[in-house]
Amino acid sequence: MVITRNMKARATSVSHRQSQQDPESPVKKFFKLVLPSTMKDKMMRIPPRFVKLQGSKLSEVVTLVTPAGYKRSIKLKRIGEEIWFHEGWSEFAEAHSIEEGHFLLFEYKKNSSFRVIIFNASACETNYPLDAVHIIDSDDDVIEITGKEFDTEHKSKKRPRDIEFDKILHDVDVMQVLKEEEEDKRVLRG
């Protein structure tokens, strides 16, 4: 049997379509344009294809993480076949000054965690300034973002492990100073 280019193209096309429908497909990224309804409804819909391929892996609460490392837990809302970022979404949007016309790129990491890159209306990635978020003291690895007001009380608060780390750094500095003083004494004696 002679295989022609058309036969190869049809076979490739069929196998490509089958791999796209595979529920184990590695679709990990999607983007969303922030529409007026997103801001008005205070929730954002996850694209249907992503839901079809990855929706069963998502727990009731997901974590959004920005490139600056800020994390926010968002409760999902399931309506029929649709899944929406819901409770916590409007606070995340407000904390990052997300507005109509912004473009968001979501990358699913695992364990219901998404990395979110935010592009503003100029089509450039937004800055993620520290003073645009409100960090709540927490003993776990999740830093909660709650709004634009960043008061000095929370600025000065540290998690217990950060306080412990500061103590260790202080002890290392003290030991270094003592070591340098001892070396200076040896040089003067010697």
From Swiss-Prot:
InterPro entries: B3_DNA-bd, DNA-bd_pseudobarrel_sf, Plant_B3_domain. One of its GO terms (molecular function) is DNA binding. The keyword rRNA processing does not apply. Its main location: nucleus. GO terms for cellular component: nucleus. It holds the Pfam family B3. Keywords: DNA-binding, Nucleus, Transcription, Transcription regulation. Residues 29-122 bind DNA. Disulfide bonds: none annotated. Residues 1-25 are annotated as: Disordered. CDD domains: B3_DNA. It is found in: Nucleus. Residues 12-23 have a biased composition (Polar residues). This is B3 domain-containing protein At4g01580. The lineage of its organism: Eukaryota, Viridiplantae, Streptophyta, Embryophyta, Tracheophyta.
